């Protein structure tokens, strides 16, 4: 079936992520719907064969088999060639952070050659006239031609022209990951991707258009008929806080700006059309994350982490973040407690009874037990538990879902039967198998409007225009990042750093396990470097290099590969921070934590997202003694009851 559906298809990839649903909405493509003769365009940074396999995904099985097939002719346009299997693949490697310039030039080519689908633009979009005036240079005197883009992105003008015509001549599908939105001006990539798809006119057709959500949880698989599982109430009964506080409080801040918040209480910033004033954070309770792996500029974070009076981390292992905490609450792993989960957040193909395999080890407790005890100390245990224990909550989630399913004509087994069997599977609705993203919108945009102010695809946004942001104009625009290969600083820091996901981890999870032994070089996180660059630096695979940015330095094991641009390196995200001098700002990280290197500025005033992929570094051979990796060794602690 895969061969039949994918014959003569092509995969065009650029690198990206969805950021602003107010402009165009996001969606998931069912891989079964990709039609014969289509160009399936993946605007990447979420490689399905890397990220979906971590979910045990049916989509991964389809994709890996599909990419191994001889039929698709795939064109990937991104700085690093990740796990691509098709022997007919073509790789185009733009400079990191320049995808917008390349796509704008493709738009220029379509417009100047008369290939734009005018009827689609007229019927389904707003603001094209203002955008195309910018593209043609009528607003700033600079025509955004393929030759113009070549000087920025490093891709030949003829290749840009060819890509534009390939996309237009056959039905094209552009797939977007969640990667290069993590860059300065990151919103522009996906906005421009949608504009390009609109110019081609394939949106809403089977196998055509765009989509963004393929990075996990069965993205690309058809959705079942089952309802989603609920969760513990965010707004406790009898209480006035909870969800309402989170939604309305002026103390809510963009997560990526928390370091700035800690360092600058009282500072006012722009965020998504509003002004936000940072609160004075005096206590931090961090659960379910690892900021010393995920937050940019680790040395800046060390300074910020010292500002609150108390920091508490609740986790299952001694992460880098737990090592910086004043108090650590040891939580159970999923093997030591009960729970319930769905099979695929997108596809929801079934529920699994997560039954306890072993008793809680040592002094650990379940998250529910920890929060219940904290609630008891604070005087609202009854409001938190609502009279239920853990199994009571699981039963409530399941039985509420069963009631909703019954309304929709789907009978589920009793909770007792479900728990004894361990799982329940749901049929996939036939309409879901035939689902065509934005097909209803294409058939009738008046009856089926988008969730934008105009109800259409907003190539130009009046709302964003009203914000008057200097870093996020009202239509897709090429803007130079602070750090990139075209900046003056690249003379001293000549390599662009990419922080892609590792195939051996899930974010920073599993870094302390045997899985990472397959990836590490001399116990260090690897740095991918091109053979030409390695030769100039006197490096070979198996060496250790010191990688330095304006913010810090980290050691990394060298892997020489031609799957990267000569002016670009990759250190995968998630290596645990292991400093030479623990707790000291500016200490050399000896393990390869890439966020020691990255810059901590907002992607723009619109989203205030992180910019992990907008960093320049320099590299030198490391011949000194290698310090042991202490990130995976239990630190010295004091018991709270001693």
Positions of PLM-derived features:
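Positively charged n-region of N-terminal signal peptides that target proteins for export
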Residues: 1-4
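N-terminal signal peptide c-region/cleavage motif recognized by signal peptidases
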Residues: 15-18
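Boundary regions of SH3-family modules and the immediately adjacent low-complexity/disordered segments
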Residues: 22-27, 33, 50, 55, ...
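SH3/SH3-like (including bacterial SH3b) beta-barrel domains
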Residues: 33-45
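Long, well-ordered, tryptophan-enriched scaffold segments
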Residues: 80-169
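Flexible glycine/proline-rich, aromatic-decorated loop/lid segments
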Residues: 80-83, 319-354
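Extended redox/cofactor-interaction regions of prokaryotic respiratory oxidoreductases
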Residues: 100-104, 197-323, 333-340, 421-537
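Long, contiguous, secondary-structure-rich segments that constitute the structural scaffold
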Residues: 361, 367-421, 508, 514-528, ...
């Amino acid at each position: 079936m895969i061969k039949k559906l994918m014959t003569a298809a092509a995969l065009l990839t650029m690198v990206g992520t969805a950021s602003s649903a107010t402009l165009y909405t996001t969606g998931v493509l069912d891989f079964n719907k990709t039609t014969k003769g289509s160009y399936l365009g993946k605007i990447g940074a979420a490689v399905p064969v890397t990220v979906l396999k971590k979910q045990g995904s049916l989509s991964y099985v389809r994709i890996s088999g599909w990419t191994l097939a001889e039929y698709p002719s795939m064109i990937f346009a991104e700085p690093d060639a990740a796990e691509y299997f098709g022997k007919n693949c073509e790789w185009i490697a733009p400079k990191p952070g320049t995808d917008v310039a390349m796509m704008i030039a493709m738009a220029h080519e379509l417009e100047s050659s008369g290939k734009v689908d005018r009827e689609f633009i007229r019927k389904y979009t707003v603001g094209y006239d203002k955008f195309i005036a910018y593209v043609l240079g009528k607003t700033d005197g600079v025509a955004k031609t393929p030759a113009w883009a070549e000087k920025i992105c490093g891709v030949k003008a003829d290749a840009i022209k060819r890509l534009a015509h390939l996309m237009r001549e056959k039905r094209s599908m552009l797939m977007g990951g969640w990667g290069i939105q993590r860059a300065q001006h990151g919103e522009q990539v996906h906005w421009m991707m949608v504009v390009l798809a609109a110019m081609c006119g394939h949106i809403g057709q089977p196998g055509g258009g765009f989509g963004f959500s393929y990075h996990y949880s069965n993205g690309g698989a058809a959705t079942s008929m089952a309802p989603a599982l609920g969760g513990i109430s965010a707004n406790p009964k009898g209480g006035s806080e909870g969800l309402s506080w989170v939604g309305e409080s002026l103390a809510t801040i963009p997560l990526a700006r928390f370091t700035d918040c800690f360092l600058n209480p009282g500072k006012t910033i722009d965020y998504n059309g509003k002004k936000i004033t940072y609160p004075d954070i005096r206590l931090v309770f961090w659960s379910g994350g690892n900021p010393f792996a995920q937050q940019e500029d680790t040395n800046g974070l060390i300074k910020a982490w010292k500002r609150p009076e108390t920091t508490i981390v609740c986790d299952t292992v001694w992460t880098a973040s737990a090592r910086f905490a004043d108090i650590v609450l040891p939580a159970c792993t999923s093997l030591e407690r009960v729970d319930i989960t769905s099979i695929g957040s997108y596809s929801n193909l079934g529920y699994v009874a997560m039954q306890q395999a072993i008793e809680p080890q040592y002094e650990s407790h379940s998250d529910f037990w920890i929060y219940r005890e904290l609630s008891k100390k604070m005087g609202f245990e009854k409001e938190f538990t609502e009279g239920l224990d853990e199994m009571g909550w699981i039963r409530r989630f399941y039985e509420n879902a069963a009631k909703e399913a019954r309304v929709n004509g789907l009978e589920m087994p009793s909770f007792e039967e479900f728990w004894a069997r361990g799982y329940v599977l749901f049929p996939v609705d036939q309409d879901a198998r035939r689902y065509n993203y934005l097909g209803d919108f294409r058939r009738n945009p008046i009856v089926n409007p988008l969730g934008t102010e105009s109800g259409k695809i907003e190539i130009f946004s009046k709302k964003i225009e009203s914000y008057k942001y200097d870093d996020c104009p009202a239509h897709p625009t090429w803007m130079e990042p602070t750090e990139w290969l075209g900046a003056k600083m690249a003379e001293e820091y000549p390599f662009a750093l990419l922080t892609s996901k590792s195939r051996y981890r899930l974010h920073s999870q599993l870094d302390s396990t045997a899985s990472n032994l397959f990836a590490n070089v001399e116990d260090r996180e690897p740095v991918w470097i091109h053979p030409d660059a390695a030769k100039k630096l006197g490096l070979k695979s198996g060496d250790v290099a010191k990688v330095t940015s304006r913010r810090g330095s980290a050691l990394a094991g060298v892997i020489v590969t031609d799957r990267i641009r000569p002016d670009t390196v990759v250190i995968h995200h998630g290596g645990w921070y292991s400093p030479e001098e623990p707790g000291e700002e500016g200490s050399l990280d000896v393990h390869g934590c890439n966020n020691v290197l990255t810059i901590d500025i907002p992607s723009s005033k619109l989203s205030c997202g992180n910019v992990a992929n907008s960093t320049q570094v320099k590299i030198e051979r490391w011949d000194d003694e290698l310090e042991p990796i202490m990130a995976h060794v239990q630190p010295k602690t004091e018991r709270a009851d001693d």
